[in-house]
């Protein structure tokens, strides 16, 4: 606001933009993804003026994503490069492991270029996660509030409990 250099004041329009949690910033392919108030965004979209819809990768699951964001109070993420996946986890201290949620965004090659398909994770309580390669083997590790370090993508149980899984395809005409 103001009419001259002497009285000009720069004021924020909103603080409800940008990255919500630094632990959600990940390099995916040749772009950078992060959790924003309206969903998962691509950093490259900030360079494209007026590209508001394409910037929100999670737009196709917006109602589910809004519920995911409102239910959590701490978010972290990791990338599984071998599967082209961005995994986002919600952690609320003191809640049961069975109530913990996560979202997997998998980058797929579609007819119109790269697209993201989403799925939901339930029952993996993640406070911090990371992935890295050692001699062509990708390791995905995470920790939670119990003080232990766990390895994802290994085995067929989670700490001795069977992993429940449901697979559903889109409705076909």
Question: Which residue stretches match the model-derived regions?
Answer:
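Beta-sheet repeat architectures centered on beta-propellers
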Residues: 16-22, 27-31, 37-173
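Surface-exposed extracellular loop regions of Gram-negative outer-membrane beta-barrel proteins
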Residues: 1-14
